[in-house]
């Protein structure tokens, strides 16, 4: 392979790579604002200037192609002087907003000013004044004074979101960003511009002024908003999810995620209507009880039913581990064949970027861990029909609000003698239930999802329930988590009394004299691997942070 030398280090590069790409691939950081690996090159910030031997002047690393034998200096006196000058130029009119800016702590301008700036200003003149609180759209606030005109947001809108909604207006130090006349910055991916903005010019109207980055823990997990399974970081402060941001995975979502997934897939975890402990219905009235009492009551009632009198509804919102335990419980404990899950497909809400029509994260995983009718068993629609006829008298539903699908299903559920629901939040289905058992949300447990392309990916706990301890669970910890005391106000975040569905099922099985006895999510997954050839050779370490494509999907991909 061809080679270049960067700061005395000889590195290999691929033909067609620029200097900044070759350096980055080999762990060498060249400062940059406007360059982004998934966007076109604009070359307008000039902070990536480097000295290249045998070239008459400094070159920008983002648009200069690497050539065999090239010698590059990123820290020479000439380079550092130019970089310092560029930083000084950018800071002339930049406001001192760091104490109130959402970007503080993850701001490239802040970082580079410390590393590459002069440390003081030579300018006494009044800074330029621009509009500071401009609502570009329903989700984005723009601060013109902070903008350094890198054009990342414009290029993202044009090239990734495929909607030309932003542009530069005016010239020189008066330049600013606006939407085109009559347009609003409202495409389904606008909040990605907040992530790629190197300063605090673009902020999320949902997250604005809510938390400092150093006060939050960050956990690598998966967005459950659709079958794409975007890789995300979940940011938590005081045991409350504050925001979600996309995490790079070239095989799934690149650097992006949709606005709907970012804003609507975590707030239910923090909601006031969380199921906190078990609920049983006695004489028509709801009664809060411990999880153990709820399980004892459920086991006692379930003993009255068997075979075709009972049905089980799993969930494409639940993990592979939850669904496997649920299916094993139904089949081994009750010899039940009436088992299925509801599908949520919206063909009108899909694009060729990220958003999928399947609005669940684990349809394939649910079906292939046992949530499907057994021999002679009924599918979801048939189960509902048999409930209407009162041939099915008992139903167990896991992590799905099936009563909200339509009024006919809601009416059918009212005819049941026994409805047991494992749920995260109060909903239309829990209101009809005779017993409600509190299930942990996806943000409170370990597990796996399989996306529409057959990539199995891990979710990890970012929020603790009553029985969990952040340090003992090996969870991500913020500065507050590490050094706070029980007397600090922010150290007393709300914890709900809930358990993962696989654990509730295991406890139910034990009460009924069954064989299920799982202690950890990994125990369930190991059993899936042993019994299902689709998962052969996998474990949590193999899946890692980027996920693994299952063998059967690899073969399909290779054939295509």
What is each of the regions a protein language model found here?
Residues 1-16, 24, 36, 51-55, ...:
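N-terminal export/assembly segments and adjacent metallocofactor-ligating motifs
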Residues 19-53:
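A basic, amphipathic helix-loop patch mediating RNA/tRNA/ribosome contacts
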Residues 22, 50, 156, 257, ...:
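Hydrophobic/aromatic ligand-binding patch that stacks against planar heteroaromatic rings
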Residues 34-39, 128, 521-528:
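Short linear loop/turn motifs
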Residues 62-67:
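Structured interaction patches on ligand/partner-binding surfaces of diverse proteins
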Residues 305, 322-323, 329, 333-534:
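Non-catalytic alpha/beta scaffold blocks inside enzyme catalytic domains
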Residues 521-560:
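Long, low-complexity segments enriched in small/aliphatic residues
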């Amino acid at each position: 392979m061809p080679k270049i030398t960067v700061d005395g280090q000889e590195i290999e590069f691929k033909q067609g790579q620029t200097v900044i790409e070759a350096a980055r691939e080999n762990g060498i950081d060249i400062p940059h604002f406007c360059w982004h690996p998934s966007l076109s090159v604009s070359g307008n910030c000039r902070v990536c200037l480097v000295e290249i031997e045998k070239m008459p002047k400094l070159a920008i690393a983002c648009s200069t192609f690497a050539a065999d034998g090239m010698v590059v200096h990123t820290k020479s006196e000439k380079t550092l002087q130019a970089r310092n000058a560029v930083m000084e130029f950018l800071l002339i009119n930049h406001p001192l907003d760091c104490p109130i800016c959402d970007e503080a702590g993850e701001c490239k301008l802040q970082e580079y000013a410390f590393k590459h700036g002069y440390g003081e200003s030579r300018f006494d003149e009044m800074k330029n004044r621009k509009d500071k609180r401009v609502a570009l759209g329903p989700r984005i606030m723009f601060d013109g004074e902070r903008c350094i005109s890198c054009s990342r947001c414009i290029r993202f809108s044009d090239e990734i979101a495929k909607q030309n909604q932003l542009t530069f207006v005016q010239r020189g130090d008066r330049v600013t960003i606006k939407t085109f006349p009559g347009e609003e910055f409202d495409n389904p991916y606008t909040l990605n511009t907040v992530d790629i903005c190197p300063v605090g010019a673009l902020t999320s109207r949902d997250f604005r002024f809510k938390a400092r980055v150093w006060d939050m823990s960050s956990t690598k997990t998966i967005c459950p908003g659709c079958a794409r399974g975007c890789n995300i970081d979940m940011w938590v402060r005081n045991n409350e999810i504050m925001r979600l941001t996309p995490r790079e995975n070239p095989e799934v979502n690149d650097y992006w995620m949709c606005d709907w997934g970012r804003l609507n897939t975590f707030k239910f975890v923090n909601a006031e209507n969380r199921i906190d402990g078990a609920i049983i219905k006695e004489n028509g009235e709801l009664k809060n009880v411990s999880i153990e009492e709820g399980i004892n009551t459920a086991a006692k009632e379930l003993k009255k039913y068997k075979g075709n009198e009972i049905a089980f509804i799993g969930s494409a919102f639940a993990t592979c581990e939850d669904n496997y335990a649920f299916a094993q419980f139904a089949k081994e404990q009750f010899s039940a064949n009436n088992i299925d899950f509801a599908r949520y497909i919206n063909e009108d809400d899909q694009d060729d970027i990220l958003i999928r029509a399947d609005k669940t994260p684990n349809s394939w995983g649910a079906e292939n861990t046992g949530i499907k009718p057994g021999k002679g068993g009924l599918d979801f629609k048939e189960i509902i029909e048999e409930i209407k006829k009162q041939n099915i008298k008992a139903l167990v539903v896991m992590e799905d609000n099936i009563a909200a699908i339509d009024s006919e299903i809601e009416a059918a559920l009212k005819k049941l003698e026994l409805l047991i629901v494992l749920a995260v939040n109060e909903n239309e289905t829990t209101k009809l239930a005779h017993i409600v058992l509190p299930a942990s949300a996806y943000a409170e447990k370990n597990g796996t999802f399989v996306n529409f392309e057959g990539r199995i990916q891990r979710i990890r706990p970012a929020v603790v329930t009553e029985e969990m301890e952040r340090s003992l669970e090996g969870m991500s910890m913020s500065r507050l988590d590490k050094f706070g005391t029980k007397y600090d106000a922010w150290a007393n975040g709300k914890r709900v009394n809930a358990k993962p569905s696989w654990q509730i099922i295991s406890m139910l099985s034990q009460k009924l004299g069954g064989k299920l006895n799982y202690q950890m999510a990994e125990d369930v997954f190991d059993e899936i691997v042993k019994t299902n050839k689709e998962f052969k050779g996998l474990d949590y370490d193999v899946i890692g942070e980027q996920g693994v494509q299952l063998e059967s999907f690899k073969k399909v991909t290779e054939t295509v």
